[in-house]
UniProtKB/Swiss-Prot annotation:
Transmembrane segments: none annotated. It is found in: Cytoplasm. It catalyses: uridine + ATP = UMP + ADP + H(+); cytidine + ATP = CMP + ADP + H(+). Pfam families: PRK (PF00485). InterPro entries: P-loop_NTPase (IPR027417), PRK/URK (IPR006083), Uridine_kinase (IPR026008), Uridine_kinase-like (IPR000764). This is Uridine kinase. Pathway: Pyrimidine metabolism; CTP biosynthesis via salvage pathway; CTP from cytidine: step 1/3; Pyrimidine metabolism; UMP biosynthesis via salvage pathway; UMP from uridine: step 1/1. It is an enzyme of class 2 (transferase). Keywords: ATP-binding, Cytoplasm, Kinase, Nucleotide-binding, Transferase. Gene3D superfamilies: P-loop containing nucleotide triphosphate hydrolases. HAMAP family: Uridine_kinase (MF_00551). GO terms for cellular component: cytoplasm. ATP binds at residues 15-22. It comes from Pectobacterium carotovorum subsp. carotovorum (strain PC1).
Length: 213
């Protein structure tokens, strides 16, 4: 029989890059943390599980298609989700967008009652879907996502506007159409208008709050 005290609820939040996933995730985390305490809820980003590329040259690293499922170490993420469900702590890798590889340090996460898992490719992997208690797809128009991504990558990740636009045209948009948008069919809840949809956030909060009862 499974120990009820060790059950960890996994909530997946997916959608296009810069669709508002992180905003919804952080809003849900912050507001629920204030209700139940940070010892009961945590957030994990799929971005932390980009594959280690320390064995590659910088020239090779920058050619990586970060919007293709093959760029992700989903096997490690799956292992970590299963460990959390078994009541074990995990060490979440950290990724450098400047060096295009994993950092040396990790982030220690203890068992939580609820883990919010967010990322663009989560719903493309059936193994990850099987670990989720329910999933959300943030459905935001691509032109809005592009503007947000340009602002974010230039200001926060040291990218040039030209490089962001080139990546969007070569990989981001094609990979969204090939992998991410089709994965929307697996979501239990679809949230339009991104992270500022307050009604949707309140509905999600009510749903997640049930797991703390």
């Amino acid at each position: 029989m499974t120990d009820q005290s060790h059950q960890c609820v996994i909530i997946g939040i997916s959608g296009a890059s810069a669709s508002g996933k992180s905003l919804i995730s952080s809003t849900l985390y912050r507001e629920l943390r204030d209700q139940v305490g940070d010892q009961h809820i945590g957030v994990i980003s799929e971005d932390s599980y980009y594959k280690d590329q320390s064995h590659l040259t910088m020239e090779e690293r920058v050619k990586t298609n970060y919007d293709h499922p093959s760029s992700m170490d989903h096997s490690l993420l799956l292992k970590h989700l299963q460990m959390l469900k078994a009541g074990q702590a995990i060490e979440v890798p950290q990724y450098s967008y400047v060096e295009h590889t994993r950092k040396q340090e990790t982030v220690h996460i203890e068992l939580k009652k609820v883990i919010i898992l967010e990322g663009i490719l989560l719903l493309t992997d059936a193994r990850l879907r099987d670990e989720m208690n329910f999933s959300i797809f943030v459905d935001t128009p691509l032109d809005i996502c592009l503007l947000r991504r340009m602002r974010r990558d230039v200001n926060e990740r040291g990218r040039s506007m030209d490089s962001v636009m080139e990546q969007y045209q070569k990989t981001v948009r094609p990979m969204f159409l090939q992998f991410i948008e089709p994965s929307k069919q697996y979501a239990d809840i679809i949230v339009p208008r991104g992270g500022k949809n307050r009604i949707a956030i309140d509905i999600l909060k009510a749903k997640i709050s049930q797991f703390f009862e």
